[in-house]
From Swiss-Prot:
Pfam families: ATG5_HBR, ATG5_UblA. Involved in cytoplasm to vacuole transport (Cvt) and autophagic vesicle formation. Autophagy is essential for maintenance of amino acid levels and protein synthesis under nitrogen starvation. Required for selective autophagic degradation of the nucleus (nucleophagy). Also required for mitophagy, which eliminates defective or superfluous mitochondria in order to fulfill cellular energy requirements and prevent excess ROS production. It comes from the Eukaryota. There is a cross-link at K144 (Glycyl lysine isopeptide (Lys-Gly) (interchain with G-Cter in ATG12)). Belongs to the ATG5 family. PANTHER family: AUTOPHAGY PROTEIN 5. It is found in: Preautophagosomal structure membrane. It comes from Candida glabrata (strain ATCC 2001 / BCRC 20586 / JCM 3761 / NBRC 0622 / NRRL Y-65 / CBS 138) (Yeast). This is Autophagy protein 5. GO terms for biological process: cellular response to nitrogen starvation; cellular response to potassium ion starvation; cytoplasm to vacuole targeting by the Cvt pathway; mitophagy; piecemeal microautophagy of the nucleus.
Length: 270
């Protein structure tokens, strides 16, 4: 896992997004409702909603600013919570329970999603009311929680300036790893109190099932084997067999593979 930090950071997923006909003026053919973009694994899909809508601005039923709080993404009629990093969402719904690298024949080259709207908002999706600033605040709030788990207090995040917070966010949106990590490394301790981990049920469901244990820094395999019902987990698109990590500390895995919200996201049969 030597170069895994930047390899994961530079990873991206090809996405085709089909807009709900209710977002568009009448008579738009189905082919014109499609938008193709590439979304970084280490990002939130909601960051790209303004770009998706901008591509079809000329045929939108309303102004982009009016639509943003009313839309969300779905996959096979399952609403996707943007609050989970995009790479993790992809892994949950695309074969993590079988082992992502187990069969290239079944590998999805383009993830096909829908951008939908309805009168009733799904309970597992946070409405975007304050635009991109809401996403930035959400990410820093998540880091505040993780800082408490790691250090026993949130002081390291609380002491960050607004400019520091903006640099973290700009690092994510501008794909500048140096800018992002320059601030984040000030939050991480040499010796953690506990480790923030989010374990997701493989293959998802109407609502992603997630357990968030705060684990002590034992070996990686020892820390998670009592929670999962498989001999491997998936993290950042990597299939990790527990037997291979009996001598690797959980914090070492966390340090290399934690996501932009501060959590180490693992996907497994629960």
């Amino acid at each position: 896992m030597g170069d895994s930090k930047e390899l994961v950071w530079n990873g991206s997923i090809n996405v085709q997004i089909k807009l709900d006909s209710r977002l568009l003026v009448d008579g738009v053919p189905e082919g014109r409702r499609l938008v193709n973009i590439r979304v970084p694994r280490e990002s939130h899909i909601a960051i790209y909603t303004p770009l998706v809508l901008e591509r079809l601005r000329n045929v939108l039923r309303s102004d982009i600013e009016e639509l943003l709080p009313k839309v969300w993404y779905s996959y096979k009629d399952i609403s996707l919570p943007w609050s989970i990093p995009f790479g993790t969402l992809f892994d949950i719904y695309n074969g993590a329970h079988k082992g992502i690298s187990g069969s290239r024949d079944n590998y999805i080259n383009v993830w096909k999603l829908n951008l939908v709207t309805d009168e009733k908002f799904p309970i597992n999706v946070i409405p975007i009311i304050e635009g991109q600033d809401q996403l930035r605040k959400f990410m820093m709030q998540s880091w505040k929680q993780c800082c408490f788990i790691l250090n026993g207090s949130s002081k390291r995040v609380m002491s960050l300036s607004l400019q520091d917070s903006l640099e973290v966010w700009e690092g994510v949106t501008e794909r500048d790893y140096a800018k992002y990590s320059g601030v984040i490394k000030r939050i991480l301790p040499r010796t953690p109190r506990r480790i923030p981990v989010a374990i997701h049920a493989a293959n998802g469901g109407p609502i992603v099932q997630t357990t968030e244990p705060t684990l002590t820094d034992t070996s990686f395999s020892q820390a998670v084997e009592g929670i999962v019902k498989a001999d491997f987990v998936v993290c950042q698109g990597i299939v990790m067999y527990l037997r291979d990590f009996s001598d690797t500390s959980l914090y070492d895995v966390y340090d290399k593979l934690h996501s932009i919200d501060g959590y180490l996201h693992l996907i497994a049969n629960l």
